[in-house]
Swiss-Prot record:
It comes from Drosophila persimilis (Fruit fly). Transmembrane segments: none annotated. Signal peptide: none annotated. Residues 571-604, 629-653 are annotated as: Disordered. Involved in nonsense-mediated decay (NMD) of mRNAs containing premature stop codons. Probable component of kinase complex containing nonC and recruited to stalled ribosomes. Residues 574-586 have a biased composition (Acidic residues). This is Nonsense-mediated mRNA decay factor SMG8.
Amino acid sequence: MGLKDYYTWTFPNIPEHVAQELDQLGRSLVVVGVIGRSRCVLANKMRAFGMEPPVDHEPTDGQLQCYYKPGSSTLLLHFETTFDDAILGQQIDETMEQDGAPFDFDGFYERMKCRFVRMMLLALHVCHILVYVETGQTFDLSLVTIFQLMKFAREQHLMQFLPSLLKETPAGRLLGEKCRLCTPRILFLFENFTHEEGKTRECVSACEFQTEDSIYELLRHHQIITNSSSSSLLALPNNKQFVFYNAHDQLHADRLLQSIEFLNLDMRKLDVKEEEDDLEVLELAPFDGFVKSFGESFESTNYEEQQYKTEHTAWHFLQRHVQDALLGCFDEGSFKQVPQRGQLQLLNAQEWHDCIAELHKLLVSSAGTQESLNEIRNEDYQVFLQSFDESLNYEKKFWAHLCEIGLKMGIEAYKKAAPAIYGSSMHQQLLAEATLAFEEEGRGPPAEASIAKMTATCLRHWQDGRQQCEQLSLRSQPCTQPKEMPHDKHNSGVIHVSSCNCGRTQGRREDPFSLRQANYEFYEHMVKMCNLCVKVKQFKFPIFEPTNNEYRAAAFEVAFPLLHAGKNRLAQDAELDPDEEDEELPTGEREEQHITQSNGCSQPLSPTFGSDLNMSIAGFGVSLNESEPCFDQSSSSEAESTCSGTSSEESNNELVLQLKEPAKKHEESCDPDSIAPLPSMCLTSTTEYLPGLVHTLSKVGLLPLFPSWSLACVGPSSIYSHNTGLQEHFQSGFLSGANFLLPWDVQLRLVHASKHYHNSHQPHMSKKQQRYRKHGDRMVLKIFVGFEYECSRGHRFMMCRPDRVLRGGADIERDTCSKMVHTNMPLYYPCPCRSQNNYLAQLMRIHVVTPKAPVNIIVDPKVCMGKDKYTFTLGSMVPPRLSQSAYWILRLPYVYQGDDALIAPPEKLEPDDIMAGGYLLAGMFGIAETDPTLDLNDQGHLDTNELGTFTRI
């Protein structure tokens, strides 16, 4: 014991001399359990009793430290639990050290709570008095929950197996049927007093009485204490104090702060109230403060307060309840209904040691181990070991119950709002609404797992015959057909309004899902509905014609689809001109040779239904072999001079057209040896077709399965009147004021052939040609051109500038059309129709009214778009000629597709970059002299040299 007045040891290692002293007490040993919270490193809750553990003490969860003061009948049993900060820190460190296991706070909290309940149950059965130590200044309401769990565990688990298991041991005879020494009396010790209140006797007593009333009401309300000892978990004294506030002793003080405080008090001197009569005495003092005391005067102290501080200690507070146990009035002082036979059992030290050893083994040391499961065959005890923690986890059950209710509400909300068939976006929206319905009730740690379960259930409900196909259309609209059920074709439910090829009839078109449906099938269907499309003669574009059933789409390099085509085109150009670098030709011969080569590459086309329209094809020269489109005006002018073989330097306002020599009869040059063979680039494949549209870098020889363009003559030029514009019965759907074509005056100067040639071949000219020749070498061609845009609602309008919609005749100036045809036109433009949605109109048709002159207008549109800068063309090796004095309409593709993927239209156009979605390149028109010697109804058998040349306007 040394300098201390008490003994301390760790259970069950009791020293022999202490055991001898305890044996001398006989059956007058009162066991007091001290349990609760602590903040010190040694987990010591005995500081209020003036006791401390050894210096080398290591706190451990579940460890019991015993204290005994000689001369008393009290054995203090100190419980080290997870409510001690030192023990809790150890458990946190062990949990954090587990590899790969994230820290689960809720699970950790439940484990700590269950371990504390085990220690409380042990104290409940082996102690006469329980002292709960609280470091705070108020009662912890969570302790009521702990008491409820203890009562539940004792009634539902412990009393099912303890009587039978203890019956075979000496502890069973000593403890009786209740398996405990008594209904223990619980006391509450608060280590700290509120600083706001004064520490006088009245203030401390008032605070203690107020806390006692609150605790008593709580424990009575939750039936922790009752009027009968047999049904009560704990006991409270009726007429004795059971709450103690430590108001005077500073427990667990900081040594450094204490030293600073002592130094401050030593340096400070308090003034004593001085009487006027003592001034003469004070004058005799050698210095100021000579007779002043270092503290309060003795007269100022209160003897009663000093006596209260001396007697108001935790030890005296405890001994009053110990005396009740020794005198045999323990139950009488706690309950109104006292049993006939007293339940309080006072044991000697050895008997008590045997009882606690057996109970500690059953409740604490062997709990949860496999050895105890194999050793003890009691079914109730095995259930206790396996499900004790789970049964006490009431919070988990509460959260699980709430999440179960929320899960039902969420699934019900999802199924109630779910339509028969819906897609992923609708599924996500319904799932978000179901989550909101779940969160009305479901919460807590299992909420995340419950939401995942609800998500899986809703997903199965969606996939059980309700899933939408969701195949995206070419306009990015999902298919609304069921995914599991077979359907012939996709349908998004979105309907567009579009016009036919000739523009006379408008029809409702479904959202296209394939290139063929968008650019070919709809317009073929509209031919049957339009009485004008049936009558017009259409230009037949070259398409793929297989020789057998084994044909496939051509494969392209996905990463660089244009690079391979560019390399092939350069290699073919090198094969066509092998001696270009070795030999320099004069300028005239080089131009003549270049024109001959370009004209010799024409591809034969089928006749146009035996049409009597003056429609032919002619070569563009180098424009057919261009690897890159001409974007600037200088490149366009250079190409024009090359194609025509003439110079326009004489006049900036005139277009020079050189009249060609009439071709000789076909019979005069039928020598097979004189016919030059067609270059290899003109050969078309019969096994592979082009999956997309033809563009400038397409692989040579590949043709599409169907034409995506349409060129039709809808009637003579007289059907258009510039005074009235396009009438509704002829072209329906145009917005008011936007139904006019733009007049285009082209000044043309004819350059005749040599005089000998002119005189010898004069009889071959037609009367119309002779009449124009008589009027002079200059003429003005009146052409009408219109760039038509159409939105998905069927609104059509013409443009007068790339950034302006035509608003009537006031917008038409003299040079408006001339500027239009020499400027890039945007492929998409916002529709001026009034709508909440911003509909984009697409360039769909180009209207051309040809003049009454012995010339043919030639069209060669090029549409540039896509991130890879595809430049789409008509696909003909030679562009078509338009007959004189006729109304022609060129219908552009509805959807554009390159070699690898679809080129989707932009969702929105910025006003400062209207060309972002694509544009029609300037310079699509050309002009050539009409040759009456050509048989235009049988163009496939014409020699390529007979097609002649033309001049780009």
